[in-house]
């Protein structure tokens, strides 16, 4: 894989973006730190299929439904499955925001980066489908 300097990246930005858009990973290196540009759809697919990304679980619970993500503090309730799903998507977004702001530094939350990236790259409809067992 090619790693370009920050200056080279800036000077060749159109080419760099076209390369990533074409599905070819391209890297940028600055002060010894490396990052990679990837096509969003491919990264989203990779994260969705990752064994590190647990699947939400839904259970009927007396007066309604509960949706939760095992090994995380993310959960939601609703009168029916649709309402619980909608509340869960909101909870996912809130967790992702909290993770970016502060939880990523906590040892018991740091490992949830695949989830946070998946949530950040997903639309509301993507997340609702994922909660319901889709991709």
Language model segments and positions:
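Generic structural signal for individual residues within well-ordered alpha-helical segments
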Residues: 10, 82-85
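Bateman/CBS regulatory modules and CBS-like beta-alpha motifs in cytosolic regions of diverse proteins
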Residues: 1-19
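Short aromatic-glycine-(Arg/Gly/Cys) micro-motifs in beta-strand/loop hairpins
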Residues: 52-71
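Extended, non-globular alpha-helical segments
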Residues: 1, 46, 56-60
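Short, charged, surface-exposed hinge/linker loops at domain edges
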Residues: 15-55, 86-135
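A short, exposed loop/beta-hairpin motif centered on an aromatic-Gly-Thr core
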Residues: 70-82
